């Protein structure tokens, strides 16, 4: 007994009323005894049961889930079938008292039944035992006017001994409802007693829902003849999971009970279609109740071999359902967050690096051996958490400490160095990058190779390579910083017979280096696309930005190359057919003459013009790519996250903005399209001018005179003033301020949780460098290293072994076909011996399973301790009062028996004394 319980017992002062005299057996059955009226009290115009000696429910009582009774008007409903069966069995629907609001017909209880229900409700163990043993006419299934029988009353008031006595009777009704009631109130010992009843010997009792049980039994889970106490889809294990009863969930799992995962929301099977057609609301509620049970920490802890993986997958599934079933969006979001909190809670209980690694990496012993060999720290759970955006799990100190250790792998001394030393290392790597690449090509497995393969060095190398690429972009335009010497209307050539376009389309050495860098980055993106798959690749916005940037670069250089080819062909024509040395004195064909023109005469669709435009866009995207590495810094990381969230808000705002903008643009164009040349300026006379005027009006760069006409058409002009004014008020005052408010709200959300957001973004950046590969940055990655050839040959050699290993795994999982088994078992004796040893290993729990079992045990113990700390004294005080009440009846029974024995002794003594007195007389 805990210290809190002892204190409660010391503080408890229970005053018991005087024992009531037993009523005469011949009492009028139609009259309601005063004793029965004291058992009930009026509440808000109705009646509410009052259990002596306290009315409060114990702390931790789980309110029943949403419940609705069946439609009695429906022909062939379970309630009508149940009532028919009860009439056939001769069960009498009695009521406790004259109030008939809860029953269609009222039948008064006999005095014996009144006394029996009283004893069961108040825990009078001696009376219940005596009536069950001696009475021949007692109906143990008699009910009060609320429809509760003796078992339900005893369970509701936590009378364990009375419940055990009642469970010994045959044909006892509503045992399932009593079990659900005991689970909801947290009466573990009563739950255990009910589960030991022969009625639960069949496992189907615990796996089928009450609505399915109604098709087989009359009232096993029923509260009364009108339906169940809880929702018809609530099974005992679902209710126990809802109420977070770990002991009860464990008992039910040992009995074979499981929560069936609902079908996919878009499932078209016959069962789902029938439920959706019959009652869509009930079907949706049943799905929510099932997911509440599946997402319960009690069920996740005790039912899954890998609770962390199960919780992560379930959180993602619930998040998707929140976006699908909008009407239950908040419910599904809470359940998804509950699963995420469970994972964080388990991670928080780790005590050493081995346990942290087990959670972050998953079960490495069940993974492919080649994958484990290639990288011991797979971090599969961290990758999954990042994919499902479980930010608190990734940003947890235990996870961050482990990631930081891997980040400085093979560079343990650098972790404790100052910022100045780290910056010096970055500078050295940037300057010596070509030499480091050569050293890695020659000796990839040397000390230098191991250092370059560390995530930090890979990050520094890639960042330095990209900085060099940006430097090339700037240097390529440095000759035009102070202006150009060749004006757009001037042509300059190296020799008289040279075509001007040949000079302008030639590639410089910086442009060639830029193209090499672009090819290297494109090769890296192709490898990443191959490894991750198209879907995972596109889901990462930085990959989309990289792909777009590189595509524009390639398009720009392609257009530039086409222009160079055309100019070269023109030059070849001139060299072959023109004899004069000065082209200005020669008449050339139009298609050749075009390439001698100055820039001001080029066509708008000229490939070189298109190339220059695309190149400018690609340069802008290249510099914006710097934001990718900003999360590595604690100061700039939150700013980059806020910028990304702001861009999302702008895209959302653009929908409303475009709608309003397009409406006024078309309206103003229709109004002024007839006045081309009759306005002060050309605003709104064409669609293009209308777009320009309204767009720059947002920034205050349009004039009010844009709506003024030269003619005296005041009506049109006034309408223009009104529409233009409404547009400015709507766009500038309303929508722009709304956008500012949205951006401010998003920034505040990031700022309030900046540490978690930054660590989550930094972890995503780190993980991109944790996997093997991408050691050398572009453009050095274009040259394959000797290690790549060795790995390629090893894959070819090990391909048959990998195939046999997959076949062995399929057979062990019961998935291999007969042909696969035949091919496998015809291998050498050594292979057979290895398979036998592998099977023997499978029979033993893996190291991961042992660690997970230890962590889950801590989690359950912590949950139970937290629950005990949260409980108030009222619940424990009521339990003490109930025990004292039962003890009172036992003492009264002992007193009654002692009185009877004393009366018998006095009678015997008087019989012996009377003859002696007569003889004396």
From Swiss-Prot:
Changing residue 847 to H: In SCA41; no effect on localization to the cell membrane; toxic gain of function effect. ANK repeats lie at residues 111-140, 146-175, 177-203, 232-261, 634-663. GO terms for cellular component: cation channel complex; plasma membrane. Residues 1-73 are annotated as: Disordered. It catalyses: Ca(2+)(in) = Ca(2+)(out). Activated by diacylglycerol (DAG) in a membrane-delimited fashion, independently of protein kinase C. Activated by inositol 1,4,5-triphosphate receptors (ITPR) with bound IP3. May be activated by internal calcium store depletion. Inhibited by intracellular Ca(2+). Residues 478-508, 563-606, 674-713 are extracellular. This is Short transient receptor potential channel 3. It comes from Homo sapiens (Human).
């Amino acid at each position: 007994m805990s210290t809190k319980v002892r204190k409660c017992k010391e503080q408890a002062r229970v005053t018991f009323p005087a024992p009531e005299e037993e009523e005469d057996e011949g009492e009028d059955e139609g009259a309601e005894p005063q004793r029965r009226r004291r058992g009930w009290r009026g509440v808000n115009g109705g009646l509410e049961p009052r259990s002596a000696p306290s009315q409060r429910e114990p702390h931790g009582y789980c309110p029943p889930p949403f419940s609705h009774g069946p439609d009695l008007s429906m022909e062939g409903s379970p309630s009508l079938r149940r009532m028919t069966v009860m009439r056939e069995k001769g069960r009498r629907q009695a009521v406790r008292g004259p109030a008939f609001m809860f029953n269609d017909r009222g039948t008064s209880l006999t005095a014996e039944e009144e006394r029996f229900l009283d004893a069961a409700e108040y825990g009078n163990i001696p009376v219940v035992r005596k009536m069950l043993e001696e009475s021949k006419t007692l109906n143990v299934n008699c009910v009060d006017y609320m429809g509760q029988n003796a078992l339900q009353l005893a369970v509701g008031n936590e009378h364990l001994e009375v419940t055990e006595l009642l469970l010994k009777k045959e044909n006892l009704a509503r045992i399932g409802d009593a079990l659900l009631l005991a689970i909801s109130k947290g009466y573990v010992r009563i739950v255990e007693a009910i589960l030991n009843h022969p009625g639960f010997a069949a496992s189907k009792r615990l796996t089928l829902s009450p609505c399915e049980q109604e098709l087989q039994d009359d009232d096993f889970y029923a509260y009364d003849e009108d339906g169940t106490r809880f929702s018809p889809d609530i099974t005992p294990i679902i209710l126990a999971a809802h109420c977070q009863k770990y002991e009860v969930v464990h008992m039910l799992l040992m009995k074979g009970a499981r929560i069936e995962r609902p079908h996919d929301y878009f499932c078209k099977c016959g069962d789902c279609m029938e439920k959706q057609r019959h009652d869509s609301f009930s079907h949706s509620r049943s799905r929510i109740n099932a997911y509440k049970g599946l997402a319960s920490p009690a069920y996740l802890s005790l039912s899954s071999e890998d609770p962390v993986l199960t919780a992560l997958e379930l959180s993602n599934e619930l998040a998707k359902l929140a976006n699908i079933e909008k009407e239950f969006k908040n419910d599904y979001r809470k359940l998804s967050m509950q699963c995420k909190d469970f994972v964080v809670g388990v991670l928080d209980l780790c005590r050493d690096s081995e346990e942290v690694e087990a959670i972050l990496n998953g079960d490495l012993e069940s993974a492919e051996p080649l994958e484990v060999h290639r990288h011991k720290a797979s971090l599969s759970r961290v990758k999954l958490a990042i994919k499902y955006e479980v930010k608190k799990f990734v940003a947890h100190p235990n996870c961050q400490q482990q990631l930081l250790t891997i980040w400085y792998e093979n560079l343990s001394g650098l972790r404790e160095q100052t910022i100045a030393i780290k910056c010096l290392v970055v500078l050295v790597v940037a300057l010596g990058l070509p030499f480091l690449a050569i050293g890695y090509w020659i000796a990839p497995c040397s000390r230098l190779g191991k250092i370059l393969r560390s995530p930090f060095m890979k990050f520094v190398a890639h960042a330095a390579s990209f900085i060099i690429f940006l430097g090339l972009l700037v240097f390529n335009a440095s000759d035009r910083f102070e202006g150009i010497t060749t004006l757009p209307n001037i042509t300059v050539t190296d020799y008289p017979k040279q075509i001007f376009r040949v000079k302008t389309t030639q590639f410089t050495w910086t442009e060639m280096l830029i193209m090499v860098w672009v090819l290297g980055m494109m090769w890296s993106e192709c490898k990443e696309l191959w490894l991750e798959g198209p879907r995972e690749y596109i889901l990462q916005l930085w990959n989309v930005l990289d792909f777009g940037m590189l595509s524009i670069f390639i398009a720009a250089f392609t257009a530039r190359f086409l222009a160079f080819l055309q100019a070269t062909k023109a030059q070849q024509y001139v060299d072959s057919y023109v004899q004069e040395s000065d082209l200005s004195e020669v008449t050339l064909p139009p298609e050749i003459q075009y390439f001698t023109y100055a820039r001001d005469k080029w066509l708008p669709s000229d490939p070189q013009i298109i190339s220059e435009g695309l190149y400018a866009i690609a340069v802008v995207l290249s510099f914006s790519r710097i934001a990718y590495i900003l999360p590595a810094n604690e100061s700039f990381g939150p700013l980059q996250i806020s910028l990304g969230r702001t861009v999302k808000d702008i895209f959302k705002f653009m929908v409303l903005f475009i709608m309003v903008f397009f409406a006024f643009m078309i309206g103003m164009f229709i109004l002024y399209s007839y006045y081309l040349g009759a306005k002060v300026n050309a605003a709104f006379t064409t669609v293009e001018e209308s777009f320009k005027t309204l767009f720059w009006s947002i920034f205050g760069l349009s004039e009010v005179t844009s709506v003024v006409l030269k003619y005296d058409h005041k009506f049109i002009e006034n309408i223009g003033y009104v529409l233009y004014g409404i547009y400015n008020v709507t766009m500038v005052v309303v929508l722009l301020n709304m956008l500012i408010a949205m951006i401010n709200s998003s920034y505040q959300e990031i700022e309030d949780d900046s540490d978690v957001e930054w660590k989550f973004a930094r972890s995503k950046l780190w993980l991109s460098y944790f996997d093997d590969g991408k050691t050398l940055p572009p453009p050095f990655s274009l040259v394959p290293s000797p290690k790549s050839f060795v790995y390629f040959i090893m894959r070819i050699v090990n391909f048959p072994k990998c195939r046999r290993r997959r076949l062995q795994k399929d057979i062990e999982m019961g998935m291999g076909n007969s042909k696969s088994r035949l091919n496998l078992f015809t291998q050498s004796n050594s292979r057979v011996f290895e398979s036998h040893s592998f099977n023997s290993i499978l029979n033993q729990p893996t190291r991961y399973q042992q660690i997970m079992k230890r962590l889950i045990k801590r989690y359950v113990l912590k949950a139970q301790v937290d629950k005990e700390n949260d409980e108030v004294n009222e619940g424990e005080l009521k339990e003490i009062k109930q025990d004292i009440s039962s003890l009172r009846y036992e003492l009264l029974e002992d007193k009654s028996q002692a009185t009877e024995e004393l009366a018998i002794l006095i009678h015997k003594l008087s019989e012996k004394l009377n003859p002696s007195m007569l003889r004396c007389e």
